[in-house]
């Protein structure tokens, strides 16, 4: 049973401006593992990576109904890729999490669907 749905869209140029010489932004948004992946990226690929993670975390927080804040922070949520490249969301939730991330020339978008783990 679906228990939550969240979606977020972000302009890539907004993330690009925040990344411009601001390591603190990445430290606030990305987990250590995500920052390690980001170190190998440059230019538009780095912007897309960070924007996709930002959107995924915002979408998750909306799906759980809290938004980013006291109950859920950016660092409580990690986005990884499985063996086939599919993004997966790692968090402490008891729900099954379905995540989709997409990019265009100007935007990154993510959708999260939370499914009850009891069937």
From Swiss-Prot:
List all disulphide bridges recorded for this chain.
none
Which GO biological process annotations does it have? Answer: fatty acid biosynthetic process; lysine biosynthetic process via aminoadipic acid
* Residues noted as binding Mg(2+) in the record, renumbered to the chain: 8, 58
Single GO cellular component annotation?
A: cytosol
Q: Where is it mainly found? A: cytoplasm
Q: Which Pfam family, any one of them, does this sequence belong to? A: ACPS
Q: Which keywords does the record carry? A: Cytoplasm, Fatty acid biosynthesis, Fatty acid metabolism, Lipid biosynthesis, Lipid metabolism, Magnesium, Metal-binding, Transferase
Reaction(s) catalysed by this chain, per the record, are: apo-[ACP] + CoA = holo-[ACP] + adenosine 3',5'-bisphosphate + H(+)
Gene Ontology terms for molecular function:
holo-[acyl-carrier-protein] synthase activity; magnesium ion binding
- According to its UniProt record, the EC number is 2.7.8.7
Question: EC top class, in one word?
Answer: transferase
- Output the superkingdom of the source species: Bacteria
* Cell location: Cytoplasm
| Purpose | Transfers the 4'-phosphopantetheine moiety from coenzyme A to a Ser of acyl-carrier-protein.
Q: Which HAMAP family match?
A: AcpS
PANTHER family, sorted: L-AMINOADIPATE-SEMIALDEHYDE DEHYDROGENASE-PHOSPHOPANTETHEINYL TRANSFERASE, PHOSPHOPANTETHEINE TRANSFERASE
* Stated family: Belongs to the P-Pant transferase superfamily. AcpS family.
The protein's name in its UniProt record:
Holo-[acyl-carrier-protein] synthase
What lineage is this protein's organism placed in?
Bacteria, Bacillati, Bacillota, Bacilli, Bacillales
